[in-house]
Amino acid sequence: MPVQGSQRRLLGSLNSTPTATPHLGLAANQTGARCLEVSVPDGLFLSLGLVSLVENVLVVTAIAKNRNLHSPMYCFICCLALSDLLVSGSNMLETAVTLLLEAGVLAARAAVVQQLDNVIDVITCSSMLSSLCFLGAIAVDRYISIFYALRYHSIVTLPRARRAVAAIWVASVLFSTLFIAYYDHAAVLLCLVIFFLAMLVLMAVLYVHMLARACQHAQGIARLHKRQRLAHQGFGLKGAATLTILLGIFFLCWGPFFLHLTLIVLCPQHPTCSCIFKNFNLFLALIICNAIIDPLIYAFRSQELRRTLKEVLLCSW
């Protein structure tokens, strides 16, 4: 994505000679001060992308194969996997092309590399936006299934889910194209940050409300069976821990990237901010880590999906 700190890796590889950098070391910022820079080796970057790619391909394949999984909830999970797949795949492609250019194996004119870089940036940005949207859509779907259980199947229908999916993809591609075209405008970066914060608040509010309802339900059962009071307390702690992990992973993996964008607007020339900008590739790696974790949280916990996945793997052998 063409923001300060990414250093336009594809274009930079045409005119610069790569130098060996430590995995973790001190680098000088613009004022000559020393700051911590975490370098992500290309091999690790590609490995993370490959793991994410395989995981999400398996999720998409399993959902597509099993008709029992053709429901609105799994439709959103499938699209989340597809978005994460594109995030990982586009970053892997950029890294691979960069390595080939640096090694002299691939020769290309600057104009061609520029166009390729723009295409990859649009794919990466649109898949990031759609991934965030589908995380929000999954939260809304689960909220409706709990608070409007009797009307769920009339509210969340497959045609409506498909229209929502289509709207998310179209909006993601459209806005990502605009963001890439006008990436040097502060308003564009602020829009991205506000969008991330909106998704974070939406997920936090919905999941906290769902946890509160679940605890109330468990408390009601405990009143009928006084001996189960300790079990109710254990349920509350387990639910709070699950919620903390879910939102914590989301914030940990996505937060640094959007902090990076925020600092570009607030303090582009400040020495401390310059140090943070140097870790842009680390922030991308964290997003890919989120693409690895998403299937574990949203997909592989389904017994039906795991059974289908096992059948797919056995048939492939």
UniProtKB/Swiss-Prot annotation:
It comes from Papio anubis (Olive baboon). The keyword Transmembrane helix applies. GO terms for biological process: adenylate cyclase-activating G protein-coupled receptor signaling pathway; intracellular signal transduction; melanin biosynthetic process; negative regulation of tumor necrosis factor production; phospholipase C-activating G protein-coupled receptor signaling pathway; positive regulation of cAMP/PKA signal transduction; positive regulation of transcription by RNA polymerase II; sensory perception of pain. GO terms for cellular component: plasma membrane. It is found in: Cell membrane. Residues 1-37, 94-118, 184-191, 267-279 are extracellular. This is Melanocyte-stimulating hormone receptor. Belongs to the G-protein coupled receptor 1 family. Glycans are attached at N29. Disulfide bonds: none annotated. Interacts with MGRN1, but does not undergo MGRN1-mediated ubiquitination; this interaction competes with GNAS-binding and thus inhibits agonist-induced cAMP production. Interacts with OPN3; the interaction results in a decrease in MC1R-mediated cAMP signaling and ultimately a decrease in melanin production in melanocytes. Receptor for MSH (alpha, beta and gamma) and ACTH. The activity of this receptor is mediated by G proteins which activate adenylate cyclase. Mediates melanogenesis, the production of eumelanin (black/brown) and phaeomelanin (red/yellow), via regulation of cAMP signaling in melanocytes. The gene is MC1R. It comes from the Eukaryota. The chain crosses the membrane at residues 38-63, 73-93, 119-140, 164-183, 192-211, 241-266, 280-300. Residues 64-72, 141-163, 212-240, 301-317 are cytoplasmic. Keywords: Cell membrane, G-protein coupled receptor, Glycoprotein, Lipoprotein, Membrane, Palmitate, Receptor, Transducer, Transmembrane, Transmembrane helix. It is a multi-pass membrane protein. One of its GO terms (molecular function) is melanocyte-stimulating hormone receptor activity.
